[in-house]
């Protein structure tokens, strides 16, 4: 006698069939709404696009190929870019070629730097280290030289190279110091100095090294060309300018901290809201912030007030060692390349520069860095 097959209740059977259908229908509706959202952006109907996302907050604003941020950069559509960033679009999102929105903005040239590249960089600085399938970072597309060091192992490698170079320089300076101090062992007026910082010690070593070289040239009676005769003066002038650069940077940082502390103390006592501002220029009037944030002329350029990047690079080279000393000149140029590299400069001084001057300052720093790279290549 055969057992009857178990009967599934009619309600459960209908539920099991409807679940995948309802899930597929929900996915299809979401995809249609996302396509409609992208059409609104392409047509410039930003209010409709924002209203659609408010009614359906689960939509993916990065969906599509190319993604909406990439399309806004390619079309030079700054209002759409600002809306997407406000709605939570991810600048690090990659398309099928591995490009981020920063890659797309970098390919639009200098005209898109202020309106597209800087807002994306401010929202997601880590995207500068993302490479596409061709192995390029946004900084390489802009011609900034070495890629942005975003991975921890690359940062450690760069730090180890920097430490190795400093140790080698310290060893050479110690050898020179031993030679110099041997000449003054019998000097009764020589006093033991207190321990000093590494920066002060290295500056003193460089000055004494230059004096020793000058004394050797005088005793040997060697005739130098005009460039070599003025090299010691240029070297001392360059050291003085480096010292002034450090002092101005420290003074600006101290002024910024004091200004922030003063504003924090005055904020509770002044509850009156600020009046509405007319535009981006109104946020930073030309007379305001002079004592706390840098404008273009406040940056310690190699030439007073900035100027032509080639002229600034030539001025830096002229202040270095003479052309006959190839090794010393290459080391000097390496220090200047590190100091004026756009990535390093942006990381170190971004908070000290007026926002509305940042594009102009970074454009000049980029041009100066490229000019220094050309001088360094010419020495190889």
Curated annotation (Swiss-Prot):
Gene3D superfamilies: Ankyrin repeat-containing domain. Residues 150-159 have a biased composition (Acidic residues). Keywords: ANK repeat, Nucleus, Phosphoprotein, Repeat. Interacts with CACTIN (via N-terminal domain); the interaction occurs in a pro-inflammatory-independent manner. It comes from Sus scrofa (Pig). Its main location: nucleus. Residues 13-28 have a biased composition (Polar residues). ANK repeats lie at residues 64-93, 97-133. GO terms for cellular component: nucleus. PANTHER family: I-KAPPA-B-LIKE PROTEIN IKBL, NF-KAPPA-B INHIBITOR-LIKE PROTEIN 1. One of its GO terms (biological process) is negative regulation of NF-kappaB transcription factor activity. It is found in: Nucleus. PROSITE patterns: ANK_REP_REGION (PS50297). Involved in the regulation of innate immune response. Acts as negative regulator of Toll-like receptor and interferon-regulatory factor (IRF) signaling pathways. Contributes to the negative regulation of transcriptional activation of NF-kappa-B target genes in response to endogenous pro-inflammatory stimuli. Residues 204-221, 236-272 have a biased composition (Basic and acidic residues). This is NF-kappa-B inhibitor-like protein 1. Residues 1-34, 131-167, 185-293 are annotated as: Disordered. The modification Phosphoserine is found at residue 150. It comes from the Eukaryota.
């Amino acid at each position: 006698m055969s057992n009857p097959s178990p009967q599934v209740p009619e309600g459960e059977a209908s539920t099991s069939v409807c679940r995948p259908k309802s899930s597929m229908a929900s996915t299809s509706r979401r995809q249609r709404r996302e396509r409609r959202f992208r059409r609104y952006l392409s047509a410039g109907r930003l209010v409709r696009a924002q209203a659609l996302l408010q009614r359906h907050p689960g939509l993916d604003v990065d969906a599509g190929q190319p993604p909406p941020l990439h399309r806004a950069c390619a079309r030079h559509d700054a209002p759409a870019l600002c809306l997407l960033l406000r709605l939570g679009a991810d600048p690090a999102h990659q398309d099928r070629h591995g490009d981020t929105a920063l890659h797309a903005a970098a390919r639009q040239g200098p005209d898109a730097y202020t309106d597209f590249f800087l807002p994306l960089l401010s929202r997601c600085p880590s995207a500068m280290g993302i490479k596409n399938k061709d192995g390029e970072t946004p900084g390489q597309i802009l011609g900034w030289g070495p890629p942005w060091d975003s991975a921890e192992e690359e940062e450690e490698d760069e730090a180890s190279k920097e430490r190795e170079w400093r140790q080698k320089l310290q060893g050479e300076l110690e050898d020179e110091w031993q030679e110099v101090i041997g000449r003054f062992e019998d000097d009764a007026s020589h006093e033991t100095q207190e321990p000093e910082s590494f920066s002060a010690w290295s500056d003193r070593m460089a000055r004494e090294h230059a004096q020793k070289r000058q004394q050797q040239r005088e005793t040997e009676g060697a005739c130098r060309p005009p460039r070599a005769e003025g090299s010691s003066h240029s070297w001392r002038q360059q050291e003085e300018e480096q010292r002034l650069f450090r002092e101005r940077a420290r003074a600006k940082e101290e002024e910024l901290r004091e200004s922030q502390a003063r504003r924090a103390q005055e904020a509770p006592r002044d509850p009156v809201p600020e009046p509405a501002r007319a535009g981006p220029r109104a946020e930073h009037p030309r007379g305001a912030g002079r004592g706390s944030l840098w404008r273009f002329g406040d940056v310690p350029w190699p030439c007073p007030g900035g100027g032509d990047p080639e002229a600034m690079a030539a001025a830096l080279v002229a202040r270095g060692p003479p052309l006959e000393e190839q090794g010393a000149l290459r080391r000097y140029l390496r220090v200047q390349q590190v100091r004026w590299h756009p990535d390093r400069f942006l990381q170190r001084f971004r908070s000290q520069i007026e926002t509305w001057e940042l594009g102009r300052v970074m454009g000049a720093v980029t041009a100066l860095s490229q000019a220094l790279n050309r001088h360094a290549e010419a020495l190889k």
